[in-house]
Amino acid sequence: MSFDVGKDKLYIQDVTLRDGMHAIRHMYGIDHVRAIAQALDEAGVDAIEVAHGDGLNGASFNYGFGAHTDWEWLEAVADVLTRSVLTTLILPGVGTVDELRRAYDIGVRSVRVATHCTEADVSKQHIGIARDLGMDVSGFLMMSHMIEPEALAQQALLMESYGAQCVYVTDSGGALDMDGVRARFQAYDRVLRPETQRGMHAHHNLSLGVANSIVAAQQGAVRIDASLAGMGAGAGNAPLEVFIAAVDRKGWNHGCDVNALMDAAEDLVRPLQDRPVRVDRETLALGYAGVYSSFLRHAEKAAADYGLDTRTILVELGRRKMVGGQEDMIVDVALDLVRERGAAA
């Protein structure tokens, strides 16, 4: 661990325009992304991630189609940034190296290469090509709660060996608590080089997004993901304006204007939420069952279509250990539950 939270500046990575896509079914308009990005840039955020919620080339029947293409969103944001680093996310197998090169041509200079927490080996080509392009590259180990800290650290070590300059603990299910976060970063410290940065991507399904991010920073995570008004899958990400307010009270160096972030969250982002991004019975079920946060809207639709309780579907998905990319199985699970209900009648 080379980062000292008491002395060094945090790297604030906003995800409103990528993870936040899930909250509104990838329906951001061009004017929306431009206004939000400009506000974030002016507020001093270090980097702004832009893509379909499931990364470059994520638009599909499985994940959902967006109001615009990745390229339209990225070009709109690239036009307004003056200091924040334009960032994107790519899932190997969903996005190809061709998409990575095209993103670079638009102006993307930082990328997070995301895999399920046990599948770091599929990130090798994407990390290598991103490094060859001269990009800043982070490894993004999704659903980090699903394996033990030492096993996660071995996956992080693979990403480091491929060239990742930072590796994340990615709590996609919002299922980790502070002890779980601490244990995972301590495991990282035992195997990763000190110069390899650590990052934290929290979800707020158990209302621990801010607390987990603070603990991560105390354990050496320099890069912290957050979003305006928590705009993200499930109960959202760590709310950016709340995290900055909390660490500002601690005297940590974050470089952001907290009032500007509050204004952007309230005036630009919250009005776009067709479903409130908050902890409620459905989003709490995500964290409780350890389910991928972006399953929420899919599960709610299946519940409405088949007369089920969303929580019942989510808990069953958790029991079956479904992971990102298996959105098409949500309807199958719902049909199984309908059959079981009929058999019991």
From Swiss-Prot:
Phylogenetic classification of the source organism: Bacteria, Pseudomonadati, Pseudomonadota, Alphaproteobacteria, Sphingomonadales
Binding site for Mn(2+): 19, 201, 203
Pfam families per the UniProt record, alphabetical: DmpG_comm (PF07836), HMGL-like (PF00682)
HAMAP family per UniProt: HOA
Site entry: Transition state stabilizer: 18
Enzyme Commission number: 4.1.3.39
Binding site for substrate: 18-19, 172, 201, 292
Residue ranges constituting the Pyruvate carboxyltransferase domain according to the UniProt record: 10-262
Active-site positions on this chain: 22
Gene3D superfamilies: 1.10.8.60, Aldolase class I
InterPro entries: 2-IPM_HCS-like, 4OH_2_O-val_aldolase, Aldolase_TIM, DmpG_comm, DRE_TIM_HOA, PYR_CT
Organism superkingdom: Bacteria
GO MF terms, alphabetically ordered: 2-isopropylmalate synthase activity; 4-hydroxy-2-oxovalerate aldolase activity; manganese ion binding
Record-stated family: Belongs to the 4-hydroxy-2-oxovalerate aldolase family.
Name under which the protein is recorded: 4-hydroxy-2-oxovalerate aldolase 2
A biological-process GO annotation: L-leucine biosynthetic process
Keyword list, A-Z: Aromatic hydrocarbons catabolism, Lyase, Manganese, Metal-binding
Species this chain originates from: Rhizorhabdus wittichii (strain DSM 6014 / CCUG 31198 / JCM 15750 / NBRC 105917 / EY 4224 / RW1) (Sphingomonas wittichii)
Catalytic activity: (S)-4-hydroxy-2-oxopentanoate = acetaldehyde + pyruvate
